[in-house]
Amino acid sequence: MAPGSRGERSSFRSRRGPGVPSPQPDVTMLSRLLKEHQAKQNERKELQEKRRREAITAATCLTEALVDHLNVGVAQAYMNQRKLDHEVKTLQVQAAQFAKQTGQWIGMVENFNQALKEIGDVENWARSIELDMRTIATALEYVYKGQLQSAPS
């Protein structure tokens, strides 16, 4: 069979020509491949480290933004609470003043009511006196008329 035909067992040796060294890995080629591999690994590590730093920076920015956003709400709630506390104190003071004023009004109304009762008592007393005086006046008039009629003229 002819070399290169199908029936022939192919081997690397049989295809080499005389004087060609056997294929052994070239040390410089392996060294170059190793350096390329290490360079690629270093590039990947640097890229990964860069991405990690970017992710940390982005996470930090996000965290700060969220905290700032929450702090705005918390600050607003705190301000609202302070306003409410102030309004409660003001309302308590006003309620106390109103209660005091109401007590004064009640006292004045009671005094006025007592004065009206006293005026009513005085009015009743005056009517009673007036009635007594009329009775006395009528009696005196009756006696006086009786004396005039019985006296000789």
Swiss-Prot record:
Annotated Basic and acidic residues bias: 1-11
Superkingdom of origin organism: Eukaryota
InterPro entries: BLOC1S1
A matching Pfam family: GCN5L1
Keywords of the record: Coiled coil, Cytoplasm, Lysosome, Membrane, Mitochondrion, Transferase
Gene Ontology molecular function terms on file: protein-lysine-acetyltransferase activity
Protein's UniProt keywords contain Transferase: yes
Ranges in coiled-coil conformation: 27-59
EC number per UniProt: 2.3.1.-
Location of the protein in the cell: Mitochondrion intermembrane space; Mitochondrion matrix; Cytoplasm, Cytosol; Lysosome membrane
Example GO biological process: platelet dense granule organization
Reaction catalyzed: L-lysyl-[protein] + acetyl-CoA = N(6)-acetyl-L-lysyl-[protein] + CoA + H(+)
Region Disordered: start-end pairs: 1-27
Cellular component, GO, one term: early endosome
Family membership noted in the UniProt record: Belongs to the BLOC1S1 family.
Self-association state and partner proteins as the record states: Component of the biogenesis of lysosome-related organelles complex 1 (BLOC-1) composed of BLOC1S1, BLOC1S2, BLOC1S3, BLOC1S4, BLOC1S5, BLOC1S6, DTNBP1/BLOC1S7 and SNAPIN/BLOC1S8. Octamer composed of one copy each BLOC1S1, BLOC1S2, BLOC1S3, BLOC1S4, BLOC1S5, BLOC1S6, DTNBP1/BLOC1S7 and SNAPIN/BLOC1S8. The BLOC-1 complex associates with the AP-3 protein complex and membrane protein cargos. Component of the BLOC-one-related complex (BORC) which is composed of BLOC1S1, BLOC1S2, BORCS5, BORCS6, BORCS7, BORCS8, KXD1 and SNAPIN.
PANTHER family given in the database record: BIOGENESIS OF LYSOSOME-RELATED ORGANELLES COMPLEX 1 SUBUNIT 1, BLOC-1 COMPLEX SUBUNIT 1
Name assigned to this protein: Biogenesis of lysosome-related organelles complex 1 subunit 1
Source organism per UniProt: Homo sapiens (Human)
